[in-house]
Amino acid sequence: MFQDNPLLAQLKQQLHSQTPRAEGVVKATEKGFGFLEVDAQKSYFIPPPQMKKVMHGDRIIAVIHSEKERESAEPEELVEPFLTRFVGKVQGKNDRLAIVPDHPLLKDAIPCRAARGLNHEFKEGDWAVAEMRRHPLKGDRSFYAELTQYITFGDDHFVPWWVTLARHNLEKEAPDGVATEMLDEGLVREDLTALDFVTIDSASTEDMDDALFAKALPDGKLQLIVAIADPTAWIAEGSKLDKAAKIRAFTNYLPGFNIPMLPRELSDDLCSLRANEVRPVLACRMTFSTDGTIEDNIEFFAATIESKAKLVYDQVSDWLENTGDWQPESEAIAEQVRLLAQICQRRGEWRHNHALVFKDRPDYRFILGEKGEVLDIVAEPRRIANRIVEEAMIAANICAARVLRDKLGFGIYNVHMGFDPANADALAALLKTHGLHVDAEEVLTLDGFCKLRRELDAQPTGFLDSRIRRFQSFAEISTEPGPHFGLGLEAYATWTSPIRKYGDMINHRLLKAVIKGETATRPQDEITVQMAERRRLNRMAERDVGDWLYARFLKDKAGTDTRFAAEIVDISRGGMRVRLVDNGAIAFIPAPFLHAVRDELVCSQENGTVQIKGETAYKVTDVIDVTIAEVRMETRSIIARPVA
């Protein structure tokens, strides 16, 4: 009798529209209950029975109930699930399988089965890729997943690599395909095989993509030819190899090994500028005046060269610093190293005065055994030989940026606009409280940004620099020329790593069009989106593998008195994040480890400080001694404790 009653339907509709609702993201806790976080200020309690309908990270709409002054949320509608495709560890066997997602806040096993056509018999401990198929808020009785890919078995030593690559849906190996002969590009190549070109790289590098030749000119000026490997001499635009490189966008460098953008025959052999092998190159000839300015007579041209020596960073640095027993194999090579060091000195001074120079941070290198075990992690400081190559590459990229801008008006540019204009006033106010006065308008210009950076670099500590980092915008890849505030340059376009960056291959093709006097097509904006996304995924993969290896490396230090110097990198309500100075590992120090009485402790992300009883006890950039309290292998997290 009530079935089609319009009054009843109207009443239901009314009740529904009058019931308060909220949209937000579910945050799970270890204790079974959770919270619906609507924004930074507002959250609602979700009781344990209701949490069974949702998963940490789900975006949902919930009905808000009020009982005795207490509000709680009842999940009603799924807006966006947190899990769609994920990696995890399989439990059970054959017909009764479940998968536990590999995520610090997802502990529950999700029932699952293998997808049709997946020929693997899953067993306990296997790693797999899964996709969610059912969700209680979609009208299903429970969560349910389908296993779509077998990754590896549980005890595989290389789990960190295979699981991470599967998680980010990245390739595991080099692309297939081989280039058998060079293309006829209609380019006249200068024969520079008689010149003493050298490469400077790590001892283990196989994909050498830059060689250098320097010459002193009579008037005190210096000339540099930067010769870059020429993969576009082998790979035609739109070919199968080109399409594969376009998707990968970059070589993916992970601790212990890399997954190249191009087939290894090209990256490590045909294109690699090996010593005593004749190779085609794209080259740039530039002249530096006595103060390091790049003169206007920049020349791009195609050539063939033969590198006369594969030099190694540390050996070159030792020789220039008069230490070690390595010697250049001939006076001609020694003269090249001396001239390149002069160019580096000049360009370094020019950039210091007219642009910006990054502070030197060490690179951390994992030394791995046969089974992927971490034998050691070494900090490799950036020395004079690293700076020689860096200055040569930056100069070459400035040249490409100018030529592409002036001749074509487009290219693949690295653009960084400094501070977000919306943050300019807040930035000026923050700096003022620390005694630095800047004009909110001026700081948005390249000159104003550089002026501020130089003032910050002159500060006794990096504390203020760390405070303003959050006001900066991100670097972007653009087809339009634009400034790079971070480098302090009017324009910057890379072309010096075409073996490992697809954007550099595009710039090679554009520069070749300029050399031949031909018209060129502007690259499509979609390619910059793909490159930015791939760069993000590759960085996340490198970080994930690193976290896993750091946890393995430090596991036996947990609970011991071994001390580590650690720099505070971030402070949040829950505690501090620190970076171990000797090996680069990130560890977390929970607030209770800083001071036992919670009411006397204030951890402020806003101020970058920890106060105890009103006194500043710690601040970002401080270096403190810590011990390792615990290493949680299942979440690859390292918990540290300050040394009292």
From Swiss-Prot:
InterPro entries noted in UniProt: CSD, NA-bd_OB-fold, RNase_B_OB_dom, RNase_II, RNase_II/R, RNase_II/R_CS, RNase_II/RNase_R, RNR_Ribonuclease
Pfam families hit by this protein: OB_RNB (PF08206), RNB (PF00773), S1 (PF00575)
Q: Which organism is it from?
A: Escherichia coli O1:K1 / APEC
> Which Cys pairs are S-S linked?
none
Q: What is its EC number?
A: 3.1.13.1
Q: What is this protein called?
A: Exoribonuclease 2
Subcellular location(s) of the protein: Cytoplasm
One term of GO molecular function = RNA binding
| A GO BP entry | mRNA catabolic process
In this protein, which residues make up the domain named RNB?
Answer: 189-516
Q: Which family does it belong to?
A: Belongs to the RNR ribonuclease family. RNase II subfamily.
Catalytic activity as recorded in UniProt: Exonucleolytic cleavage in the 3'- to 5'-direction to yield nucleoside 5'-phosphates
- UniProt xrefs under HAMAP family: RNase_II (MF_01036)
Q: Which GO terms describe its cellular component?
A: cytosol
Q: Which PANTHER family does the record associate with it?
A: EXORIBONUCLEASE 2, RIBONUCLEASE
Q: Where does the record place the S1 motif domain?
A: 561-643
